[in-house]
């Protein structure tokens, strides 16, 4: 597989250079920051964007967000996503973004062509910066900043590109990006860490009644089913295990709509899902179904460095500068 991986790496480099040379001069009226990764699987992009938007808002900076809207079936794109937009039109991650950020007045636009999404958003409203949820390899879109997220637990795998490894681009691509953000506290050999993010379990939410229980006060059962249709189900299981729970993990394909068969088990133990999966649920809600809400925390020093590299000016709003959200991807 290694010769094929070398060929893939060479093609990825050639494509990047060709598109960068073609589109590098097509800047927008506001800076664009792409938040993505160079490896397959979930690394926490969506919750990181939510946390970053909140941190920027606390500093008086208004951000907008664009996304591909994977899974959305709207008849016409670009589509502005609001808190009451049907999830089937926009996809699960944009819906979650809208639920978390609508109170801040953060515009969210989806389109299969992210370039079109950025142009539509900037014609729709004025923002100080546009954040692109993924799109690191979408080189036809001009970007002023590139932020790469890496899951600390998985690192970069064997360091090889597809199909011999998990990487979409060669490791040396990290030398070209502006900031590297690691999800977790693990050190990755040969990779700099410009900042770290971390998920902290906050509370359990009973979907049928909307009752909440603080994460450290969970008394329902020590053994639970964890069901997650996200890019990295193991990270979700780790969040539950950090609370002392024994997790029967049921990972599903990313973006899958959970069916009754995914949520019903003969033992009637509590079933816990992610907030990303909860936005897609329809029909009757089982009485033993819960959502784990987590807090994503960004280091203030990373946010300050991001603002400086983007050429933005922060204002002292007197607001709390810690950014949290209740998502997990």
Residue ranges of each PLM-predicted region?
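Phosphate/Mg2+-binding loops and adjacent switch elements
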Residues: 69-191
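Residue-level signal for inorganic ion chemistry
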Residues: 7, 46, 97, 133, ...
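Phosphate- and divalent-cation-binding pockets in alpha/beta enzyme and binding domains
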Residues: 42, 116-120, 235-236, 280-281
């Amino acid at each position: 597989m290694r010769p094929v991986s070398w060929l893939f790496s060479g093609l990825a480099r050639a494509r990047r250079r060709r598109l960068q040379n073609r589109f590098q001069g097509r800047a927008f009226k506001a800076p664009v920051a792409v938040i993505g990764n160079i490896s397959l699987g979930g690394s926490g992009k969506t919750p990181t964007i939510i946390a970053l938007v909140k941190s920027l808002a606390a500093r008086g900076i208004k951000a907008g967000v664009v996304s591909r809207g994977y899974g959305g079936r709207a008849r016409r794109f670009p589509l502005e996503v609001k808190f009451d937009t049907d999830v089937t039109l926009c996809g699960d991650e944009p819906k979650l973004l809208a639920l978390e950020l609508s109170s801040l007045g953060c515009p969210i636009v989806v389109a299969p062509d992210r370039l079109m999404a950025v142009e539509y958003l900037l014609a729709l409203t004025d923002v100080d910066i546009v954040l692109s949820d993924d799109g690191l390899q979408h080189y036809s879109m001009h970007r002023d900043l590139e932020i790469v997220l890496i899951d600390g637990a998985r690192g970069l795998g064997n360091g090889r590109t597809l199909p011999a490894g998990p990487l979409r681009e060669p490791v040396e691509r990290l030398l070209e990006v502006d900031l590297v953000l690691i999800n977790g506290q693990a050190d990755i050999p040969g990779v700099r860490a410009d900042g770290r993010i971390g998920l902290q379990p906050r509370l359990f939410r009973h979907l049928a009644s909307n009752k909440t229980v603080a994460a450290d006060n969970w008394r329902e059962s020590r053994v639970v089913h964890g069901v997650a249709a996200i890019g990295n189900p193991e990270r979700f299981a780790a969040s539950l295990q950090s609370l002392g729970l024994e997790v029967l993990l049921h990972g599903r394909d990313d973006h899958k709509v959970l069916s009754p068969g995914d949520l019903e088990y003969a033992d009637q133990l509590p079933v816990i899902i992610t907030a990303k999966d909860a936005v897609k649920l329809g029909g009757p809600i089982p009485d033993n179904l819960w959502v784990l809400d987590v807090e994503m925390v960004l280091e203030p020093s990373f946010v300050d460095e991001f603002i400086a590299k983007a050429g933005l000016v922060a204002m002292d709003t007197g607001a709390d500068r810690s950014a949290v959200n209740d998502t997990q991807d």
